[in-house]
Amino acid sequence: MFTLKKSLLLLFFLGTISLSLCEQERGADEEENGGEVTEEEVKRNILSGIANGINRVLSWFG
């Protein structure tokens, strides 16, 4: 049970970091494009952040 709680806490922490990195990247894109960010860019950033978080977790357990 402790291992499960620890794993869930780790996933939550990594998810929070990934989302904050996506927000920073989106902010940088807005500055480059004069404030315009397409919906496609937002989705790509979120999905890449999630994928990076999953890869990190899997590398720790694998």
Swiss-Prot record:
Keyword entries, A-Z: Amphibian defense peptide, Antibiotic, Antimicrobial, Cleavage on pair of basic residues, Cytolysis, Hemolysis, Secreted, Signal
Xref: InterPro entries: Frog_antimicrobial_propeptide
**A Pfam family:** FSAP_sig_propep
Proregion span(s): 23-42
Question: Hey, which family's this protein in?
Answer: Belongs to the frog skin active peptide (FSAP) family. Brevinin subfamily.
The job of this chain, per UniProt, is described as: Antimicrobial peptide. Active against a variety of Gram-negative and Gram-positive bacterial strains. Not active against fungi. Shows weak hemolytic activity against human erythrocytes.
UniProt name for this protein: Amolopin-p-MT1
> Which species is listed as the source?
Amolops mantzorum
